[in-house]
A protein has these predicted regions:
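Cytochrome P450
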Residues: 1-226
Length: 226
């Protein structure tokens, strides 16, 4: 199912659609900066980085403006915590809390398509021509909204930190704005938001001369590769 769902989602996020979102992003950045510029300071993560990611995907998906602040608060809540008592308990999952709202959006798009990502999602088809059931649509819509939120906001925040510590880079990028994509790429490589990933070996294997037994938990350090 993962491959089917990935193919379905990939068909929605086309280069043309993302390009059309650029003008909105420019206006969004100015709007967010206007909110704190007169103060002379801000908490860059919630006030700019996190807000940028939430509002950007909200615009692509066609989420009403009046609901975006609610979703920003929900997705920005502290991560779920595992309690130390038994039986095992975890904190609230923001994607679960969002389900009623997203279900309402999807029902509306089924009846009234609007040309946004959610409208395309509810009318999307798998490769064999079948349609996702409603629960699958709900899960995919919330996944689309939440995917990349944390990593993107961290990348934005790290980029701001680097520029704050390197006035020379600020001046260079102002003089050579065509180098901004290179700066973003290098920030992602040098101090990316995802440091490690974990994998479970399902069978005996080897990496080079290192034997790895089935059941071994592996830690993949992306920073080491950079």
């Amino acid at each position: 199912k993962h491959a089917e769902h990935r193919m379905l989602m990939g068909s929605l996020l086309t280069f043309k659609r993302l390009k059309q979102n650029e003008e909105y992003l420019h206006g969004l950045s100015e709007m967010l900066i206007d909110r704190f510029i007169d103060k002379g300071s801000c908490d860059i993560v919630p006030e700019f980085a996190h807000a940028t990611t939430v509002y950007a995907i909200s615009d692509l998906m066609g989420i009403p403006m009046e609901d975006r602040a609610i979703l920003l608060e929900q997705i920005g809540a502290p991560p779920s915590q595992v309690q130390g008592d038994a039986p095992l308990k975890v904190g609230p999952d923001p994607l679960v809390a969002m389900k009623p709202l997203f279900d309402a959006y999807l029902h509306d798009r089924l009846a009234n398509p609007r040309g946004d990502l959610m409208s395309e999602l509810v009318h999307a088809r798998f490769k064999d021509g079948t349609s996702p059931d409603f629960d699958t649509l709900s899960n995919l819509a919330r996944f689309l909204f939440g995917a990349g939120q944390d990593t993107t906001s961290r990348l934005i925040a790290m980029g701001v930190l680097v520029l704050g510590e390197r006035p020379d880079l600020q001046e260079r990028l102002r003089a050579e704005p065509d180098r901004i994509p290179d700066f973003i790429e290098e920030t992602l490589r040098y101090d990316g938001p995802v440091k490690v990933a974990y994998r479970l070996a399902t069978r005996d294997t080897a990496i080079g001369d290192l034997a790895i037994a089935a059941g071994t938990i592996l830690t993949v350090c992306y920073a080491a590769a950079s």
